[in-house]
């Protein structure tokens, strides 16, 4: 199973799309978490596109819903571990997404350097996309 990060969904929903998700992961293996849903849908200005994206995201299996206190605390631990290791993790939300992925033993498919840093200090299974 693969948790697809916001950085990938942005490229999928972009018009014209810069990538096809199916080239990188079987759609039946895709899951999400609510922080990804929020990040994806909050970026839409057009109401019709927002509605389509919202329906698409909420049709996916959702892990860690509702998110429990220990997920947030683990995310904080990841952020702090990165700082101790001299790594810059720019987004606390990425730590939250990574914490959820680690807890459920999911790969994270992304185009975001934060996950590369988190993978260096944790058991995160990071799968970075290369966009052309």
Where are the regions a protein language model picked out?
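Short, hinge-like loop/turn segments at secondary-structure boundaries
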Residues: 47-51, 83, 125-129
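Acidic active-site catalytic centers that drive phospho-/nucleotidyl reactions
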Residues: 5, 94, 112-114
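Short, well-structured N-terminal submotif of metal-dependent ribonuclease cores
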Residues: 1-35, 42-55
């Amino acid at each position: 199973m693969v948790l697809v990060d916001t950085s990938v969904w942005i490229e999928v929903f972009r018009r014209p799309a810069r990538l096809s998700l199916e080239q990188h992961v079987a759609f039946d293996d895709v899951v999400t978490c609510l922080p990804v849903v929020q990040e994806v849908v909050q970026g839409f200005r057009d109401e019709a596109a927002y509605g389509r994206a919202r329906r698409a995201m909420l049709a996916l299996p959702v892990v860690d819903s509702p998110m429990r206190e220990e997920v947030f605390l683990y995310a904080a631990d990841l952020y702090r571990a990165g700082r101790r290791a001299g790594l810059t993790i720019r987004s606390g939300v990425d730590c939250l997404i990574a914490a959820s992925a680690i807890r459920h033993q999911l790969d994270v498919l992304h185009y975001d350097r934060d996950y590369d840093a988190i993978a260096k200090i944790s058991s995160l299974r990071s799968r970075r996309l290369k966009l052309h």
